Amino acid sequence: MNKPENFEEAIEIKRDPEDFSVEEIADIEPDPNGKYTIIKARVRDWDTNRIAAEIARRLHMSRKRVTFAGTKDKRAVKLQYFCINSADVDVASLSGIKDFEVIESFKSSHYLTLGDLIANHFKIRFYGIDPEMFRERYVHIISKGGFPNFFGDQRFGSRRRNTHEIGKLIIKGEYEEAVKKYIYDEKYDKESYRKHFIDTLDYKTALERFPHSLSFERSLIGYYARNGTFKGAFDSLPKNLTIMFVHAYQSYLFNRILDERLKIYGLNAVLPGDIAFPVDAYFNPDKSKPIEVNSYNREKISKLVSSDKIRISLPIFGYKTWIDNSDFGDVEYGILKEEGISQDDFKNKDFAYLSSSGDRRIISAKPINFSLENNVVEFTLGKGIYATVFLSSIGRLKENVYSDSEAEL
């Protein structure tokens, strides 16, 4: 990713999960007559999809009945909301889950889905850069209009940075190749049982050798064992998990577009044909009020961008996404062409739930509620804005990521 300045000092984070904490800020109204149970939990060192699966297992219910508002870094301590599609939940049965503590639970009429957050508050211990230099860089970034709103690397996998590659295969209808890449990717996987299954398709041996902790891989292999095909195998996984593959590829495309925008125009350019949105204090855009930049309003919008009232956006490609009617629109089309993808490819003819109409995302943001004491920094970011991306604008980020055999998203 392109950075606004050439800051190359390394910032190391996540030596321990406790070095990186995040608390979700949500607006969920309790309702004693609600049909859903909301749980706020302290979660340590769990992948979000895997802890959701464990919650479902402890409650003896389908994984599909457990939802959450946002995926979080695995190697971290999270205060996170989960929604159980039942008003009758034995919350005490969750007490035995390692590194998981229920902080509060209540009934609600609100069904929690991805994106149902206002913001996230972070507290991060960092190493390798002087705190005063960190503060100077922060002041510089704020004065220059913020940091580029890239999707963070964790969007593409905690350990195996290939979810966007799997997503592209799904979009192109290459389901067998997508399943195989999920089960075994030679760039990341060293376990012999993974490669053996891909080489032989011997599902009996695979189900004996794959550990039960790799529940998603086992589900895919089990589907193949029952059906003799990979085409519908992703139906055996939670839908929100499979959709994340598609979203990861869309995020990859957005990052490519934003990177090109920065190279050509920088972070703060306002072009005729750009689409802008009003933003709140957290830099959450109001997408119900798009504004197209033209020669008459360009100067006014530039001033509103400078005062953090408005932000320019770029497309997240889908089958309904409009390409910018600006000088930059040709670059957006060019990236699709380079990828060998059309917008129609995002309308999945085999599995409707894997279709995506697309979206737009603002190109820059700022942290708020910033504080720095010694080598611990705290700040708040709007939903979908990545703390690791902000840190990458301060210096070269070094994340400590597990190298164990668990395949994670």
Swiss-Prot record:
Record keywords: Isomerase, tRNA processing
Residues of the TRUD domain: 146-365
InterPro entries: PsdUridine_synth_cat_dom_sf, PsdUridine_synth_TruD, PsdUridine_synth_TruD_CS, PsdUridine_synth_TruD_insert, TruD_catalytic
Magnesium among keywords: no
GO biological processes: tRNA pseudouridine synthesis
Pfam families documented for this protein: TruD
Top EC group: isomerase
Active site (UniProt): D73
EC numbers on record: 5.4.99.27
GO MF annotations in UniProt: RNA binding; tRNA pseudouridine(13) synthase activity
Domain of life: Archaea
TM helices/strands, residue ranges: none
Reactions this protein catalyses: uridine(13) in tRNA = pseudouridine(13) in tRNA
UniProt record similarity statement: Belongs to the pseudouridine synthase TruD family.
Classification via NCBIfam families: tRNA_TruD_broad (TIGR00094)
Record function comment: Could be responsible for synthesis of pseudouridine from uracil-13 in transfer RNAs.
Protein name: Probable tRNA pseudouridine synthase D
Organism: Thermoplasma volcanium (strain ATCC 51530 / DSM 4299 / JCM 9571 / NBRC 15438 / GSS1)
